[in-house]
């Protein structure tokens, strides 16, 4: 089975110049843990809930609520995104993608074709496919 058969094709993305608070809002409201970051049409990085947590200096300093929100409005996505992103092709074998996620200890892989983001595959997508293959009602 190929990655293109399992990946999510409609992917929420962020621009490198978006405020960090936007990433927080999208992740919280959409229950999303990973967001690819684009610069035009080119994949520039990725940001995860873990990255947001690490960058929330206001929380680390004991501030909460509005102070944390104000800090997130001053930071840009490009300030905290992971720039060295492991990617795969839509034609990659699903087993190879799973092995790569396990080896790198990452929860998702952006799917790129001709330097353009075409999808995203996550641990959840793989588990859902497994359930389908087992004949489970989803």
Regions found by a protein language model. Give the residues of each.
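Non-catalytic, surface-exposed connector residues within folded enzymatic/regulatory domains
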Residues: 17, 46, 71-74, 91, ...
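The conserved cystathionine-beta-synthase
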Residues: 14-31, 37-38, 87-105, 112, ...
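A glycine-centered beta-loop-beta connector
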Residues: 27, 35-51, 101, 109-125
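Short, functional N-terminal and low-complexity linear motifs
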Residues: 19-23, 44-48, 62-68, 93-96
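Tandem CBS (Bateman) regulatory domains
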Residues: 1-10, 49-85, 98-102, 122-138
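Short, surface-exposed, polar/charged, turn-prone segments marking secondary-structure boundaries
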Residues: 34-35, 41-42, 63-66, 73-75, ...
